[in-house]
């Protein structure tokens, strides 16, 4: 596929839409042939504000040092990053706030069990922001539409890469309306119910608006 990225970026800006690009980390040096800084500089020059490096190596000290350089060079060129795959937050964002979030927790595309997703707020989220790549509405794996939407409130992270497994966004109504209205940063948080692996209900406030999200396992329960 031949894609004129500068033209796509220009068209998006014309419509008031920014572009976040997925970049396969395997093509970047030393794992691939392309120089990281040259790629970042080129994309920034085209007007790309955000990147999502994926398939990144993160299992050794050398890998993490490479990731730190990746983030540092992105900061130099004023690029926001969301690191995909297995890297778990380790405090790097304190130095480089352009690292908005990262996956590192078995994202939704892996179709994890509900018990896994109900443990994340008590485990993975303790170390930093998390992009779970939630599905806007799949109706799969015994999950309901509201369960999927609640992740946008419960999971901590200023960027959630919401997936649409069925294609056209025009077929969604209230899901899309909620997605467009839910904030990405919060002023206050209250935990209303918390049973690791079973259920979690959290209220978050942005300005004067409160949002409440609840996720539950297969057992019915009433929360007051």
What are these regions (language model features)?
Residues 1-144:
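Aromatic- and carboxylate-enriched substrate-binding clefts and catalytic-loop regions
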Residues 57, 166-168, 216:
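A mature extracytoplasmic/lumenal domain signature
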Residues 81, 154, 212:
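Hydrophobic, well-ordered secondary-structure elements that form the walls
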Residues 101-110, 183-190, 195-196:
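Extracellular glycoside hydrolase catalytic/binding regions
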Residues 145-149:
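Conserved active-site and cofactor/substrate-binding residues in soluble primary-metabolism enzymes
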Residues 150-192:
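Catalytic cores of secreted or luminal carbohydrate-active enzymes
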């Amino acid at each position: 596929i031949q894609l004129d990225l500068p033209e796509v970026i220009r068209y998006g800006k014309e419509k008031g839409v920014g572009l976040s690009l997925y970049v396969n980390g395997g093509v970047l040096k030393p794992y691939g042939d392309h120089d990281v800084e040259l790629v970042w500089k080129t994309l920034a020059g085209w007007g790309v504000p955000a990147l999502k490096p994926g398939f990144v190596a993160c299992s050794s000290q050398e890998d993490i040092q490479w990731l730190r350089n990746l983030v540092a060079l992105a900061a130099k060129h004023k690029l926001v990053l969301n690191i995909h795959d297995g890297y778990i937050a380790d405090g790097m964002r304190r130095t480089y706030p352009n690292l908005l979030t990262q996956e590192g927790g078995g994202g939704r595309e892996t179709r994890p069990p509900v018990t896994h997703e109900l443990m994340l707020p008590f485990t993975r989220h303790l170390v930093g922001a998390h992009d779970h790549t939630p599905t806007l509405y799949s109706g799969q794996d015994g999950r309901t539409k509201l369960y999927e939407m609640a992740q946008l409130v419960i999971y901590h992270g200023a960027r959630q890469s919401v997936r649409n497994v069925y294609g056209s966004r025009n077929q969604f109504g209230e899901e899309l309306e909620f997605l467009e209205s839910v904030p990405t940063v919060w002023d206050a948080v209250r935990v209303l119910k918390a049973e690791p692996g079973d259920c979690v209900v959290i209220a978050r406030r942005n300005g004067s608006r409160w949002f409440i999200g609840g996720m539950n396992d297969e057992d019915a329960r009433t929360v007051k």
